[in-house]
Amino acid sequence: MKKLRLATLAAGLAAAASFLSVAPVQAQALSGSGGQTVDTIAAVVNNGVITRRELDERMGLITRRLNQQNAPVPPMDQLRQQVLNQMVLERIQLQKAKEDGITIDDATVQKTLERLAAANNLTLDVYRSRIEAQGVPWTTFTSDARTELTLSRLREKEVDSKVTVSDAEVANYIASQRGPNAGLTSDLHLQHIFLKAPLNASETDIEAAQRKAQALLAEAKGGANFEKLAKSNSQAPDASKGGDTGFVSPSKLPPEFVKAASALRPGEVNPDLIRTSDGFEIVRLVDRRAGQGTSSDAPKLVQTHVRHILLRVGDGMSEPQARQKLLEIKNEIAAGGDFAKFAHTYSQDGSSSQGGDLGWISPGETVPEFERAMNSLQDGQISDPVRSEYGYHLIQVLGRRESEGSVAQQMDLARQAIGQRKAEQAYADWLRELRDTAYVEVKPTLSSTQ
């Protein structure tokens, strides 16, 4: 499970929504009373606009973040076009959400902010101070959170809820993990170009996609820049990243990709197109490295041996008191105290009689806040107080192991992997269709803006 850490989450929200939360500015509002232009339009998106100021602000934020991370900053014209394209997609989605009547009330936003704070082991007031210290006004951050929730709810309604995974797909997935590639333990770093051509498309459309794919394959094999080819032509969700998957375990890749990569050396492009049920793929192996996988033939789940001390809030115990008490206990344990004895004495959970020991926990068996904190700990490490719906926890990880789990758990893991892959592709297709049916006019003077 992804860990919600302060820096990445705050930066993500600030980048994603600080420019979406501004309501579309009507053209007649862009001039001052004296006729002097105070802002100009970068793009018209249906019945709204993206202003040059919004675009420049987002570019400034992204540039600052890249500089802080010592990451290369793309040429300004290239960055501007990429940022504007993303803003157009986001604006179209927000307009669609409004049409669908999707709204996020204040209570939901507040609960989300509280969960973000709790995930970082902070009170909401301290969390707010940290955000504002990064130069992001709290009103902007709150608006950004509302935007992210809106887009998430829209995707759930329009895409994720419609993705289905059949039992046959699950069986085939598990069988593929038991096939000739099941023993591979090398993580694979790939690049790919995807051209959509589902099996139920017309023969004309399939042939056109195949011709284009063959032409791109010839360019890639001839030494053309693969990243540029992917950015310009791929219809996959990662096209903007040059089709770069990063290092991925073979179990999380389509079996066709793994089979192709097994015969390639780093830097080589698969000599043939890969035909999938969704279209045509061109695959290039960037590199491989020793992975974390095993040669076992079944999907794995990571179980965690964990114990905790729970203090419930209420009945004379306030939140500050609970946090302070657990911090005191943590300090005493660090000084040589026995965790199990403290759990037996203080914990208000049923596990107190076992010294707080919960045994081996599988993913999804605890509340999200507990699981996120648990997953962030190293073996033997003790957390700071963690807030959940039950109160405050002091958590210690005792060990981890891989387990095949039950047949039902294996099937659930397979269903999740397939569903996630299908949802990402369905979302990319839906976004593309949404973009194709929208009226978008990019102002011609944009390219001359510095």
UniProtKB/Swiss-Prot annotation:
Localisation per UniProt entry: Periplasm
Enzyme nomenclature, EC number: 5.2.1.8
Keyword terms: Chaperone, Isomerase, Periplasm, Repeat, Rotamase, Signal
InterPro entries tied to this protein: OMP_Chaperone_SurA, PPIase_dom_sf, PPIase_PpiC, PPIase_SurA, SurA_N, Trigger_fact/SurA_dom_sf
Main localisation: periplasm
Signal peptide coordinates: 1-27
Any one Gene Ontology molecular-function term assigned to this protein's record: unfolded protein binding
SUPFAM superfamilies named in the record: FKBP-like (SSF54534), Triger factor/SurA peptide-binding domain-like (SSF109998)
Catalyzed chemical reaction(s): [protein]-peptidylproline (omega=180) = [protein]-peptidylproline (omega=0)
One of the protein's GO biological processes: protein stabilization
PpiC domain residues: 185-287, 301-399
Pfam assignment, any one: SurA_N
Entry keyword Chaperone: yes
Comment on protein domains: The PPIase activity resides only in the second parvulin domain. The N-terminal region and the C-terminal tail are necessary and sufficient for the chaperone activity of SurA. The PPIase activity is dispensable for SurA to function as a chaperone. The N-terminal region and the C-terminal tail are also required for porin recognition.
PANTHER family according to UniProt: CHAPERONE SURA (PTHR47637:SF1)
Biological role: Chaperone involved in the correct folding and assembly of outer membrane proteins. Recognizes specific patterns of aromatic residues and the orientation of their side chains, which are found more frequently in integral outer membrane proteins. May act in both early periplasmic and late outer membrane-associated steps of protein maturation.
Protein name listed in UniProt: Chaperone SurA
Source organism of this protein record: Paraburkholderia xenovorans (strain LB400)
